[in-house]
Regions:
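Catalytic cysteine-centered active-site loop
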Residues: 64-65, 87-140
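Bacterial signal peptide processing site
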Residues: 42-45
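...with weaker cross-activation on analogous glycine-rich loops/strands in unrelated enzymes
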Residues: 117-178
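Solvent-exposed, polar/charged alpha-helical surfaces in well-ordered, non-transmembrane soluble domains
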Residues: 75, 79-83, 104-108, 139, ...
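C-terminal motif of bacterial Sec signal peptides marking the signal peptidase cleavage site
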Residues: 37-40
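Post-signal-peptide N-terminal segment of Sec-exported extracytoplasmic proteins
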Residues: 48-98
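Bacterial N-terminal signal peptides that target proteins for export
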Residues: 3-30
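Glycine- and charge-enriched low-complexity intrinsically disordered segments
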Residues: 183-196
Length: 196
């Protein structure tokens, strides 16, 4: 007489009722949800940046101090952005109480401190008006963009000395990072000056 499969596998060892494997529909739904979360800061139609591809962007050896065109508003943006470090990331979030995604953080800070209305997604921000800025000409409150193959998927606020504030991803918090880090250097697509 053959032993039952459950006995051979030690099924009695696991508590609870045996459950059937998830249906394909559930797996497809889970996959779709994960894809939506991975798109986090994106949104809208894909916009190709006219900035050089990340492979050709050279970061300066040292980060020169560049005076912003509007120092008072740039300082207000800078201080507010740094003050939000530690706020939880939340996809679609745009307030300190609810948390921030990358473009929600940028929108909130510029609206709150400089009375500037900006587009809501990182892609739309990259395509918005304002001069493109070379890495060695970055000034406080400039927007820095990241992505793959020229498609913008992420945005942060430059604060000086090669550093920027951003809301990175699910499970993280608003934080300071350095443009010289391996990841951000490889994904850098360009910068724009909003305050003029």
């Amino acid at each position: 007489m053959k032993p039952e499969l459950g006995a051979a596998c030690g099924a009695a060892h696991y508590p609870g009722k045996a459950r059937p494997a998830p249906a394909r529909g559930c797996i497809a739904l889970l996959f779709a949800c994960v894809c939506v979360l991975l798109a986090s800061c994106g949104g809208g139609e894909a916009v190709r940046s006219n900035a050089p591809s990340s492979a050709s962007v050279k970061m300066p050896r040292s980060w020169p101090v560049v005076t912003p065109e509007d120092p008072e508003r740039a300082n207000a943006v800078l201080m507010r952005a740094i003050g939000l470090v530690g706020t939880p990331y939340r996809w679609g979030g745009n307030t300190p109480e609810s948390g921030f995604d990358c473009s929600g953080l940028v929108n909130y800070v510029f609206r709150d401190m400089a009375n500037v209305a900006l587009p809501r997604t990182s892609r739309d921000l990259a395509a918005s008006k304002g001069p493109r800025i070379a890495p060695e000409r970055l000034a406080a409150a400039d927007l820095v963009f990241f992505g793959n193959g020229g498609t913008v998927t992420h945005v942060g606020i430059y604060v000086g000395e090669g550093r920027f504030v951003h809301a990175p991803s699910t499970g993280g918090t608003v934080r300071l990072d350095h443009l010289d880090s391996t990841y951000w250097r490889a994904h850098y697509t360009g910068a724009r000056r909003v305050l003029r």
